[in-house]
């Protein structure tokens, strides 16, 4: 992975966390605790599912050319 790609992934993660903490956390917790979320922070789009594979497939079906930040709602780590 090139330095540019690493930088882009770092930016994606930073923006994904910021979007979740500032805008999504208050509206998603506690109703969706434990579910997985795929976030496209530049478009401020997100997808939720109880299954990590299904949430990835939903996100890619809607936005096939985008990259996503993945998390588990209400948890520090997805696994």
Residue ranges and their predicted role:
Residues 1-31:
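Short N-terminal "domain-start" leader segments
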